[in-house]
């Protein structure tokens, strides 16, 4: 290494003293791509666990964990009638698990996978590049999708609300928002 100002090493490589007699092509090894695997579910999260959302539009809300999707995201719901959180996907890094559990018997989550939450993209109008508008067909499909979503939300919430009503104060607990004050120490709290 050559030394530069103030005695620091600079990235200059020396030429080797000896040269190979035969020029041989050195084999080029490609890196093996890692297979995408679903994120492992945290130990403290199990179906029926009440989670606190830490980021996003619903931060501070308490939700019920239903299942883990193939992508590794968590499927959660408020229930919507209690605290306004619909069926949604959440990354488990942005959740805080509590010791509270809800009985999920009768809740059917088989139809909910990652494609259920997909949307149709709006086509850009070539005349006006800044506005992307849905066609009439896409608008009809979107309204049908929204109506189906409402029915699915109701189908999940009905047995869930029945289970919530069985436990005293659980409905109020789910409806209340999670907050911290200045002197609170979250690492010492038990949720």
From Swiss-Prot:
Pfam families from the UniProt entry: Ribosomal_L6e
GO biological process, one term: ribosomal large subunit assembly
Transmembrane segments: none
Keyword annotations: Ribonucleoprotein, Ribosomal protein
UniProt GO molecular function: RNA binding; structural constituent of ribosome
GO annotations of cellular component type: cytosolic large ribosomal subunit
Similarity remark: Belongs to the eukaryotic ribosomal protein eL6 family.
Descriptive protein name: Large ribosomal subunit protein eL6
